[in-house]
């Protein structure tokens, strides 16, 4: 039976945005954090999606909004407690996402031992590219990601540098929560995260696959 909702527009109906933190060793070092023994997980709401053409919004409560460039895995069917060996059978495709982060707020949350919700889960905190079918990326661990702010290269990394592989992450997450068709998993960011401000232009891409562009705005409320 054909899907009633197109995966090519997963951001319009997908329920869950699962994010993996500290999955590149170089980013762990730049954040002066300890390397994790298991994936570090947090969630964003579906209202965090900002498809290309819409702006990145700066929350009123932060003075230090950062970009984090990430490969996202788009789930193609319901996934519960799957093995690492079978995990890729549940993948429909990929996208490029930004995990926009209120870094000053996150730092305070860390100091107080609080969740990162205020720092990570605000409206438009997950800018997203077009959907890329699985067939167009035969090896998701052999990609080069890049990000520029106002034409200046900020982030450049290879997915081969992930600490936890995509099959491992899918299996791990699926044993904690059921993943549904249209859900995505953000797989972590390489080094080079940094601040953006109102009127900046963010460009990002996967070499040889796609690129995307966003304007940073401050909402009028």
From Swiss-Prot:
The modification Phosphoserine is found at residue 37. Transmembrane segments: none annotated. It comes from the Eukaryota. Oxaloacetate decarboxylation is competitively inhibited by oxalate. It is found in: Mitochondrion; Cytoplasm, Cytosol. Requires a divalent metal cation for activity. The keyword Nucleotidyltransferase does not apply. Keywords: Acetylation, Cytoplasm, Hydrolase, Isomerase, Lyase, Magnesium, Manganese, Metal-binding, Mitochondrion, Phosphoprotein, Transit peptide. GO terms for biological process: oxaloacetate metabolic process; pyruvate metabolic process. Pfam families: FAA_hydrolase. GO terms for molecular function: acetylpyruvate hydrolase activity; acylpyruvate hydrolase activity; fumarylpyruvate hydrolase activity; metal ion binding; oxaloacetate decarboxylase activity; oxaloacetate tautomerase activity. Residues 1-24 form a transit peptide. The modification N6-acetyllysine is found at residue 110. The modification N6-succinyllysine is found at residue 112. Its main location: mitochondrion. InterPro entries: Fumarylacetoacetase-like_C (IPR011234), Fumarylacetoacetase_C_sf (IPR036663). One of its GO terms (cellular component) is mitochondrion. It catalyses: oxaloacetate = enol-oxaloacetate; oxaloacetate + H(+) = pyruvate + CO2; a 3-acylpyruvate + H2O = a carboxylate + pyruvate + H(+); acetylpyruvate + H2O = acetate + pyruvate + H(+). NCBIfam families: PRK10691.1 (NF007967). Tautomerase that converts enol-oxaloacetate, a strong inhibitor of succinate dehydrogenase, to the physiological keto form of oxaloacetate. It is thereby required to maximize aerobic respiration efficiency by preventing succinate dehydrogenase inhibition. Also acts as a weak oxaloacetate decarboxylase (ODx), catalyzing the decarboxylation of oxaloacetate (OAA) to pyruvate and CO(2), and as such is likely a regulatory enzyme in the TCA cycle. Also displays acylpyruvase activity, being able to hydrolyze acetylpyruvate and fumarylpyruvate in vitro. Belongs to the FAH family. Homodimer. This is Oxaloacetate tautomerase FAHD1, mitochondrial. The lineage of its organism: Eukaryota, Metazoa, Chordata, Craniata, Vertebrata.
């Amino acid at each position: 039976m054909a899907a009633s909702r197109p995966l090519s527009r997963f951001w319009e109906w997908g329920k869950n945005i699962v994010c993996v933190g500290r999955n590149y060793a170089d980013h762990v070092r730049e954040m002066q954090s300890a390397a994790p023994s298991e994936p570090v997980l947090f969630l964003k709401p579906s209202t965090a999606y900002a498809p290309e053409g819409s702006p990145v919004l700066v929350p009123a409560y932060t003075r230090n909004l950062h970009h984090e460039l990430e490969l996202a895995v788009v789930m193609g069917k319901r996934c519960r407690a799957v093995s690492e060996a079978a995990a890729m059978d549940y993948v429909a495709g990929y996208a490029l996402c930004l995990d926009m982060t209120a870094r000053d707020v996150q730092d305070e949350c860390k100091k107080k031992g609080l969740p990162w919700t205020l720092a990570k889960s605000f409206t438009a905190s997950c800018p997203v590219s077009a959907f890329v079918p699985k067939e167009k990326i035969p090896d998701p661990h052999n990609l080069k990601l890049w990000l520029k702010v106002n034409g200046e290269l900020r982030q450049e990394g290879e997915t081969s540098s992930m600490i936890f592989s995509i099959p491992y992450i899918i299996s791990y997450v699926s044993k904690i929560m059921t993943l549904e068709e249209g859900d995505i998993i953000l797989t972590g960011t390489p080094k080079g995260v940094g601040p953006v401000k109102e009127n900046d232009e963010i460009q990002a891409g996967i070499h040889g696959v796609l690129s995307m562009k966003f304007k940073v705005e401050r909402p009028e409320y």
